[in-house]
């Protein structure tokens, strides 16, 4: 299936049914009172996050979604039937914006999340509601309300804990295959990966994380060159980036350091926030080099890119600040277990810190609410 991560659609809820104007007609009751029922509600349009839906391709072909109108009211105080709602299944990670206002309508972040995109109109009132002591035979009823209508922009940003970044053919797809059950297409030529691939990396029964592999970047990606620029947005929700570098390119004229610096430059030009995300360096394809050559190339590469970070100190607590360096072979799995182990440690510590921060903010908000409450004089003796 073709990977589609953007679409524009129109949604329109149904109109409420009109209320009925009707009077009782029974034998021996020549002047029966009003008995017009209310109209039914119009159908609404909902978006629902579905973990089994992976692309927005359906919304490229069907552009408009119109819910049905509610049924009009009937005599004998019978209400009109409400129209069925429409539920649009969308991938988890879909961001929905109103094209006219720019407002974010919904951010679908978990399976089963449901958001109303267009609310159906209320049914009109039948004339039974307008009976009074001065008007025993009202002919008044109200029409149903119009349903909401919107033009929407759908944008899919995959949800992953870790994102792989690098030039085409750096070995990102091989890495995600080595550490997860994902099976992306792998071949010895650039741009084998044409859309994001997700892989779940399982550490044990209780710990796992999601890794995203996007098409490789090339110089000029921020301006639209190559394929990767379309998918950089998918890295915006990740908590950690792995910059994968081919340390043993087949083309001897290729300079890994220059390519790595070009990637960093493209990242900065595309989005400062994305550039500022925690980023670890992964030197790949060590299986192509003997030990001495690997050490020589690694030292030359680190000097060329200005890597002068100390080795992280994890003796007392996992070091969250210092960028990390890994030397691996995704093909032979050399070094990959240590890599995923440290990623898991990082993500676990990150979640703990975020939970503590959220708890502290909640406590501070509660204190502020208490301080803002008006003080009363209850229980204070005030002699007259």
UniProtKB/Swiss-Prot annotation:
Its main location: cytoplasm. GTP binds at residues 166-173, 191-195, 213-216, 284-287, 329-331. Keywords: Cytoplasm, GTP-binding, Hydrolase, Magnesium, Metal-binding, Nucleotide-binding. CDD domains: Obg. The keyword Hydrolase applies. Residues 20-46 are annotated as: Disordered. Residues 33-43 have a biased composition (Gly residues). InterPro entries: G_OBG, GTP-bd, GTP-bd_Obg/CgtA, GTP1-OBG_CS, GTP1_OBG_dom, GTP1_OBG_dom_sf, OBG_GTPase, P-loop_NTPase. It is found in: Cytoplasm. GO terms for molecular function: GTP binding; GTPase activity; magnesium ion binding. One of its GO terms (cellular component) is cytoplasm. GO terms for biological process: ribosome biogenesis. Belongs to the TRAFAC class OBG-HflX-like GTPase superfamily. OBG GTPase family. Monomer. An essential GTPase which binds GTP, GDP and possibly (p)ppGpp with moderate affinity, with high nucleotide exchange rates and a fairly low GTP hydrolysis rate. Plays a role in control of the cell cycle, stress response, ribosome biogenesis and in those bacteria that undergo differentiation, in morphogenesis control. This is GTPase Obg. It comes from Neisseria meningitidis serogroup B (strain ATCC BAA-335 / MC58).
